[in-house]
């Protein structure tokens, strides 16, 4: 299931689009305020960001520009402003698309799916190149299997549903099994940005991943916390 953060201050529009996308296997978090959008996006680390332009606190163009320096996923502007100048500005700010709210829902869905597919393929290709894996090599740790081509994770013969962001985090940890990965390394490898000492999105994502992989929340033994250093994927904890 793909995850989306939709920054939209019109509650009716946000609800309608979120409900439509949910019917098509997309999990949508609606954030109504522009000045809280960046915090929500970095915390949720979604597969795609959908942005309105006219927002309270901070406009969508500025959010797009500021976010692009910290987050590498697809950003799509969804707006009622039918202006060539705004369209051009959005692309220059780092958006991958500019879609009008009058666009039929089915067309919106198709375009979002296109950007999600393109991002997944680009991320997978980058990961395979960096780890020098053959195209068909899955990783196996006891009862855990991670298939990078089909992007499928199974634990004790049960498929685990992971978002693209969660899969990439698991893949990054698993390909460095037994090694301590600090927040800076994880952020650089996954998003291309440095850790600023305040960003807690990695901690939130690790917590979410542990829950899905049935790790012990109180005393994690599969994805361990190494105090003041980072996180360690334990290769022998998956029996």
Swiss-Prot record:
Q: How is it modified after translation?
A: Phosphorylated by RstB.
User: What is the stated purpose of this protein?
Assistant: Member of the two-component regulatory system RstB/RstA.
| Record protein name field | Transcriptional regulatory protein RstA
The ranges the UniProt entry gives for DNA binding are 136-235
4-aspartylphosphate carried by residues: 52
Top-level taxon: Bacteria
Under what conditions is it induced? Induced by low extracellular levels of magnesium via the PhoQ/PhoP two-component regulatory system.
Which GO biological-process labels does this protein carry?
Answer: regulation of DNA-templated transcription
Where mainly located? cytoplasm
Response regulatory domain residues are 3-116
Q: Which SMART domains match?
A: REC, Trans_reg_C
Question: Which compartments is it annotated to reside in?
Answer: Cytoplasm
Keywords annotated in UniProt: Cytoplasm, DNA-binding, Phosphoprotein, Transcription, Transcription regulation, Two-component regulatory system
GO terms, molecular function: phosphorelay response regulator activity; transcription cis-regulatory region binding
GO cellular-component term (any): protein-DNA complex
Q: What PROSITE patterns does UniProt report for this protein, alphabetically? A: OMPR_PHOB (PS51755), RESPONSE_REGULATORY (PS50110)
């Amino acid at each position: 299931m793909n995850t989306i953060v939709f920054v939209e201050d019109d509650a009716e529009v946000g609800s309608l689009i979120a409900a439509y996308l949910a019917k098509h296997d997309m999990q949508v978090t609606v954030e109504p305020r522009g000045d809280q959008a960046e915090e929500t996006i970095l915390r949720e680390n979604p597969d795609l960001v959908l942005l309105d332009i006219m927002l309270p606190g901070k406009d969508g163009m500025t959010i797009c520009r500021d976010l692009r320096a910290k987050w590498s996923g697809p950003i799509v502007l969804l707006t009622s402003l039918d202006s060539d100048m705004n369209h051009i500005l959005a692309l220059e700010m780092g958006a991958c698309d500019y879609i009008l709210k009058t666009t039929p829902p089915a067309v919106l869905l198709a375009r979002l799916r296109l950007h999600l597919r393109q991002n997944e393929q680009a991320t997978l290709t980058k990961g395979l190149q960096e780890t020098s894996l053959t195209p068909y090599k899955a990783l196996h740790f006891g009862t855990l299997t991670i298939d990078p081509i089909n992007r499928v994770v199974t634990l004790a013969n049960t498929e685990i549903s992971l978002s693209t962001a969660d899969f990439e985090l698991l893949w990054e940890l698993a390909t460095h099994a037994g090694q301590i990965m600090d927040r800076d390394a994880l952020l650089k490898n996954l998003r291309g940005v440095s850790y600023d000492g305040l960003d807690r999105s990695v901690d939130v994502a690790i917590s979410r991943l542990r829950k899905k992989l049935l790790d012990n929340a109180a005393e994690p033994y599969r994805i361990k916390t190494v105090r003041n250093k980072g996180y360690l994927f334990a290769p022998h904890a998956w029996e």
